From Swiss-Prot:
It catalyses: 3-phosphoshikimate + phosphoenolpyruvate = 5-O-(1-carboxyvinyl)-3-phosphoshikimate + phosphate. Its EC number is 2.5.1.19. One of its GO terms (biological process) is aromatic amino acid family biosynthetic process. Catalyzes the transfer of the enolpyruvyl moiety of phosphoenolpyruvate (PEP) to the 5-hydroxyl of shikimate-3-phosphate (S3P) to produce enolpyruvyl shikimate-3-phosphate and inorganic phosphate. It comes from Photorhabdus laumondii subsp. laumondii (strain DSM 15139 / CIP 105565 / TT01) (Photorhabdus luminescens subsp. laumondii). It is an enzyme of class 2 (transferase). This is 3-phosphoshikimate 1-carboxyvinyltransferase. Monomer.
Length: 428
């Protein structure tokens, strides 16, 4: 296995231009495929998850043209349902942002499609989405373990009244919302339990609006969707920078700035993970917002106790930032860490202990007390891009850190370590 040793970083300063958002990129690709007319997507993320979506769309007969650097994509929309004549198997890696929406999309009309992926994908639950789609008439079979991929999707979803559990992943609701306007009948989606990661639903609704479809909802509990609608291309769509990826550079500035300015997101961003900057501010960092940037300056950091259900990905960065804050930090209401690329609660607790932190791992929370001095460690990344990027922050101490399998950042930010190095200064 490859490894990367990061030597202690004494100072962080500069500007980072963010790659496109994974969440926005894959939603936009699917809506562009559904839409009437061609759509030119710019600042598309070039990463493993996006490649899986692009490969799947190509296999399903959607034509598109990519720029040489893969950040601009012109998609020829089909103006309706995505159907495929004859059986086909689509391999989606560990891309939840491809698996969940495509499951719903391919339930429209008639299909004969198998959706599969890496071993970890087969451990990530999808039963709540399948249950909801079946309520609307879809025919879906589990090919291995009940409630988990791989799936055999045959179509049949016509809409109607559907109940979906909101407690595990907002991607289930996103998948239903994007597919429902194309169903034969009107749909009424009822949320059971507390809806996690609500800002990600706002991303979905904003994107759908850009493609001509508006959805009404009652306090995120019941969503009303007219059937037999058509998505219409906006012509051009600019993909925002990835707010989750911004978190590492903003946290680095809070710990060892200098000042870091992140461009590609701003005060009017679609993404809930921009709220991460507000959390850093509560901890003591200095934050400044512009229309298309956010800037962080070093401050004296103190621990916090917060519900971070709305920013689960960026909350991971708070867990490693806590190593540099006075007192304990508690991150609450994050059960859905357990069903991400790995069981992130267990992984985070395990690796934080390696660097000397005192950690209490609860079912849906983590309590972190930093050590007087961080210990050198080899950090396991669990094939999880965010684990690798979060633990790079350990190098902001006077202790080196070794990141195992650093290439796993290719899922969302292939160039991450080069960009971190560009902003870093070390004692000569």
């Amino acid at each position: 296995m490859q490894s990367l040793m990061l030597q202690p970083i004494s100072y962080i300063n500069g500007t980072i231009n963010l790659p496109g958002s994974k969440s926005v990129s894959n939603r936009a690709l699917l809506l562009a495929a559904f839409a009437k007319g061609a759509t030119c997507l710019t600042n598309l993320l070039d990463s493993d998850d996006i490649r899986h979506m692009l490969n799947a769309l190509a296999a399903l007969g959607i034509s598109y043209r990519l720029s040489d650097d893969r950040t601009c994509c012109e998609v020829d929309g089909i103006g309706g349902l995505i159907t495929h004549q004859g059986p086909i198997e689509l391999f989606l890696g560990n891309a939840g942002t491809a698996m969940r929406p495509l499951t719903a999309a391919l339930c429209l009309g008639k299909n004969d499609v198998v959706l599969t992926g890496e071993p970890r994908m087969k451990e990530r639950p999808i039963g709540h989405l399948v249950d909801a789609l079946r309520q609307g008439g879809a025919e879906i079979d589990y090919l291995e373990q009940e409630n988990y991929p791989p799936l055999h999707v045959k179509g049949g979803f016509v809409g109607g009244k559907v109940m979906v559990d909101g407690r595990v992943s907002s991607q289930f609701l996103t998948a239903l919302l994007m597919a429902a306007p194309l169903a034969e009948n009107d749909s009424e989606i009822h949320i059971q339990g507390e809806l996690v990661s609500k800002p990600y639903i706002d991303i979905t609704l904003a994107l759908m609006k850009s493609f001509g479809i508006t959805i009404n909802h009652d306090q995120y509990q019941i969503f009303h969707i007219k059937g037999r609608q058509q998505y219409v291309s906006p012509g051009h769509y600019l993909v925002e920078g990835d707010a989750s990826s911004a978190s590492y550079f903003l946290a680095a500035a809070a710990i060892k700035g200098g000042t870091v300015r992140v461009t590609g997101i701003g005060k009017n961003s679609l993404q809930g993970d921009t709220k991460f900057a507000n959390v850093l501010e509560k901890m003591g960092a200095k934050i400044r917002w512009g229309d298309d940037f956010v800037e962080c300056e070093r401050g004296t950091l103190t621990g916090i106790d917060m519900d971070m259900n709305e920013i689960p990905d960026a909350a991971m960065t708070i867990a490693t930032t806590a190593l540099f804050a006075a007192g304990e930090t508690v991150i609450r209401n994050i059960y859905n860490w357990r069903v991400k690329e790995t069981d992130r609660l267990h992984a985070m607790a395990t690796e934080l202990r390696k660097v000397g932190a005192e950690v209490e791992e609860g079912v849906d929370y983590i309590r972190i007390t930093p050590p007087p001095r961080l210990l050198p460690a080899e950090i396991g990344t669990y094939n999880d891009h965010r684990m690798a990027m979060c633990f790079s922050l350990v190098a902001l101490s006077d202790t080196p850190v070794t990141i195992l399998d650093p290439g796993c950042t290719a899922k969302t930010f292939p160039d991450y370590f080069n960009q971190l190095e560009r902003l870093s200064q070390r004692k000569s």
